[in-house]
């Protein structure tokens, strides 16, 4: 086998990945999706949340939850019924084993630095 036949696919892959990384603001077909676009995994969305309303609905990219909004803690599944909190907020939730397995541990976004009572 010729060395050219081995190196060509590697060079093409590096070129494709390099061009993709060099144009981060461009709208993507699979990654870098805007809010409202169909998604399969949270990693595809600019916002960091692939949201679905029910178990049979199509998931779409959505903004992260703001303070006092309902949220899901970060998990290993690709989609959320409620988006995780924005940066600087935490999702206060009572976790359970069943809730972790069935993705039904929900809470509300809170600012831990907020000192008002």
From Swiss-Prot:
Signal peptide (UniProt feature, chain positions): 1-22
Pfam families: Colipase (PF01114), Colipase_C (PF02740)
Places the protein is found: Secreted
Disulfide feature: 39-50, 45-61, 49-83, 71-91, 85-109
Annotated protein name in UniProt: Colipase
Species of the source: Xenopus tropicalis
Main location group: secreted
Stored InterPro entries: CLPS_chr, Colipase, Colipase_C, Colipase_CS, Colipase_N
Homology family: Belongs to the colipase family.
PANTHER family: COLIPASE
One Gene Ontology molecular-function label: lipase binding
Keywords in alphabetical order: Digestion, Disulfide bond, Lipid degradation, Lipid metabolism, Secreted, Signal
GO BP annotation list: digestion; lipid catabolic process
GO cellular component: extracellular region
Function, as annotated: Colipase is a cofactor of pancreatic lipase. It allows the lipase to anchor itself to the lipid-water interface. Without colipase the enzyme is washed off by bile salts, which have an inhibitory effect on the lipase.
Assembly and interaction partners: Forms a 1:1 stoichiometric complex with pancreatic lipase.
Domain of life of the organism encoding this protein: Eukaryota
Gene label: clps
């Amino acid at each position: 086998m010729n060395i050219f036949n081995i190196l060509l696919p590697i060079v093409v892959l590096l070129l494709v990945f390099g061009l993709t990384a060099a144009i981060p603001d461009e709208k993507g077909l699979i990654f870098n999706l805007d809010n409202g676009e169909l998604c399969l995994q949270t990693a595809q969305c600019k916002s960091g949340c692939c949201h679905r309303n029910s178990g049979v609905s199509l998931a779409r990219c959505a903004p992260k939850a703001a303070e006092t909004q309902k949220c899901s803690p970060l998990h290993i599944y690709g989609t959320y019924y409620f988006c995780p909190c924005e940066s600087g907020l935490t999702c206060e939730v009572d976790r359970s084993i069943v809730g972790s397995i069935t993705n039904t541990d929900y809470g509300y976004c809170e600012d831990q630095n907020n000192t008002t009572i």
